[in-house]
């Protein structure tokens, strides 16, 4: 079987927007729920991948890489309580204004609270761990695709907006094993424009 990108459209959009914004360094902690995004990143030589089995250590690695390189760094972990291990490092990143995009893969949010194993509520992270948090749902139609594109653009923008800091994406995944997609979709970069900024030419 040829191995390319996952067929999950929301993950494709995340990857395409990371590339379009020049974000390439990824620290991945192994797991089942984040398999689709990590495997797709490993297929693409654009991404500079680092592996760290312990999420607490991975978060501090991201702090160091962001501080030293000045680049935006991606963290990826599986579902369940593994994402909680990011919190000490993200707290440091929050107070140091380090641009770390934390992608926690997850089952559908409607399974939270119904005794599904390894399924936790990530809708309200502690106030001093991230500057913003977004849930990236599975894409079923054009409206879902638009919503996904806007949220991921917002998340990337938030990494450096008003001083910046860590941002959380809760990425819903079905755990698809179809890696037949050879090309990422074309995506639209949405730039934030504030007072005093120059609008792009029409």
Predicted regions and their residues:
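N-terminal alpha/beta PP-like core and its mobile active-site loop of ThDP/TPP-dependent enzymes
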Residues: 1-202
């Amino acid at each position: 079987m040829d191995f390319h990108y996952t067929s999950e459209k929301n993950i494709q959009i995340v990857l395409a927007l990371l590339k379009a914004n020049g974000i390439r360094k990824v620290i991945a902690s192994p797991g089942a729920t984040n398999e689709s995004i990590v495997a797709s990143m490993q297929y693409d030589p654009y991404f500079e991948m680092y592996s760290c089995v312990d999420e607490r250590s991975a978060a501090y690695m991201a702090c160091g890489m962001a501080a030293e390189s000045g680049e935006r760094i991606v963290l990826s972990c599986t579902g369940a309580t593994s994402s909680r291990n990011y919190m000490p490092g993200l707290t440091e990143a929050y107070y140091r204004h380090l641009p770390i995009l934390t992608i926690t893969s997850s089952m559908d949010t409607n399974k939270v609270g119904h005794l599904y194993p390894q399924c936790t509520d990530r809708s309200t992270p502690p106030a001093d761990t991230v500057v913003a948090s977004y849930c990236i749902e599975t894409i079923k139609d054009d409206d879902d695709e638009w919503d996904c594109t806007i949220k991921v653009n917002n998340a990337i923008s938030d990494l450096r907006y008003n001083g910046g800091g860590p941002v959380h994406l809760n990425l819903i995944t079905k755990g698809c094993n179809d890696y037949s997609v050879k090309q990422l979709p074309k995506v639209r970069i949405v730039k934030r424009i504030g007072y005093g900024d120059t609008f792009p030419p029409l």
